[in-house]
Amino acid sequence: MSEVITITKRNGAFQNSSNLSYNNTGISDDENDEEDIYMHDVNSASKSESDSQIVTPGELVTDDPIWMRGHGTYFLDNMTYSSVAGTVSRVNRLLSVIPLKGRYAPETGDHVVGRIAEVGNKRWKVDIGGKQHAVLMLGSVNLPGGILRRKSESDELQMRSFLKEGDLLNAEVQSLFQDGSASLHTRSLKYGKLRNGMFCQVPSSLIVRAKNHTHNLPGNITVVLGVNGYIWLRKTSQMDLARDTPSANNSSSIKSTGPTGAVSLNPSITRLEEESSWQIYSDENDPSISNNIRQAICRYANVIKALAFCEIGITQQRIVSAYEASMVYSNVGELIEKNVMESIGSDILTAEKMRGNGN
């Protein structure tokens, strides 16, 4: 004989009216069913409001008071409205609206490019395109020569000789403060002051996050793709080449046999860091940069602008593909014309669809 189990709803939660339970693990099936049905009720209540829903400022998001208000929302007359144009995001019971376009929101571990905005007491304020300036502490930078020691008062007096207002640098987001501003560091030699190149800017939403944001490109050019949408194009240096070689992964130098049979030692990455660290704060650009390098930098900058114009996510592969597609135009200035940018963007998307990895 089977027993009929009925479900009744009381005070917003479901309860089992039967006393029948199977206590195999110390928790009754009735309690599990009650929790499952309750969660289903919460999910179905917001079924009409999809997580991918796009809302506009002033639009009603939900009238259910169960949700906690997050960024991009405001509360009025027991109802939650959107304060920005964006997509609705729900994490547990936190309801927020992510803007379609807006300022960069830093996250720990982000590789960013910034500009020194102010020199203060043992710190620099850096513009990274966010709602607030980031902070770079004096203790978070490498000193010239690569010497690891405590920062002294003399170092504080020489802060402007290291980095001054207007200088560009790439850094990593070390942590976030309570107000959402970022704390940066440049303790690695892959970070620091930027020289011998050109700056360009795209919306931060177009930068595809990856493990590495510094890439060596054809034409002896290196690109630094800041997650914040700030991009730096420069002539490839010895340090950039060393990171792409097997010796960059070993602290000791690697022996190799030359064509004459003699054994030679390739310089290790550590030695290159020591030599380059004396010039990391120099204001002088390399005078030997040729016109071909300058033209290649401008071509890369224009194809990046073309990708941004077509709202295509920017990656190393797409930059190289766009660069190759742009070679049919001998005049670099033509690349920023509307029809040319649309043509390059169309070629990139078509090539990716042909390869079967179009997004």
From Swiss-Prot:
Residues 246-266 have a biased composition (Polar residues). One of its GO terms (molecular function) is RNA binding. Its main location: cytoplasm. It comes from the Eukaryota. One of its GO terms (biological process) is exonucleolytic trimming to generate mature 3'-end of 5.8S rRNA from tricistronic rRNA transcript (SSU-rRNA, 5.8S rRNA, LSU-rRNA). It is found in: Cytoplasm; Nucleus, Nucleolus. GO terms for cellular component: cytoplasmic exosome (RNase complex); exosome (RNase complex); nuclear exosome (RNase complex); nucleolus; nucleus. Residues 242-266 are annotated as: Disordered. Pfam families: ECR1_N (PF14382), KH_6 (PF15985), RRP4_S1 (PF21266). The modification Phosphoserine is found at residues 28, 268. The modification N-acetylserine is found at residue 2. Residues 107-187 form the S1 motif domain. Changing residue 136 to P: In RRP4-1; temperature-sensitive(ts) lethal mutation. Present with 4840 molecules/cell in log phase SD medium. Belongs to the RRP4 family. Component of the RNA exosome complex. Specifically part of the catalytically inactive RNA exosome core complex (Exo-9) which may associate with the catalytic subunits RRP6 and DIS3 in cytoplasmic- and nuclear-specific RNA exosome complex forms. Exo-9 is formed by a hexameric base ring of RNase PH domain-containing subunits and a cap ring consisting of CSL4, RRP4 and RRP40. Interacts with LRP1/RRP47. Non-catalytic component of the RNA exosome complex which has 3'->5' exoribonuclease activity and participates in a multitude of cellular RNA processing and degradation events. In the nucleus, the RNA exosome complex is involved in proper maturation of stable RNA species such as rRNA, snRNA and snoRNA, in the elimination of RNA processing by-products and non-coding 'pervasive' transcripts, such as antisense RNA species and cryptic unstable transcripts (CUTs), and of mRNAs with processing defects, thereby limiting or excluding their export to the cytoplasm. This is Exosome complex component RRP4. It comes from Saccharomyces cerevisiae (strain ATCC 204508 / S288c) (Baker's yeast). The lineage of its organism: Eukaryota, Fungi, Dikarya, Ascomycota, Saccharomycotina.
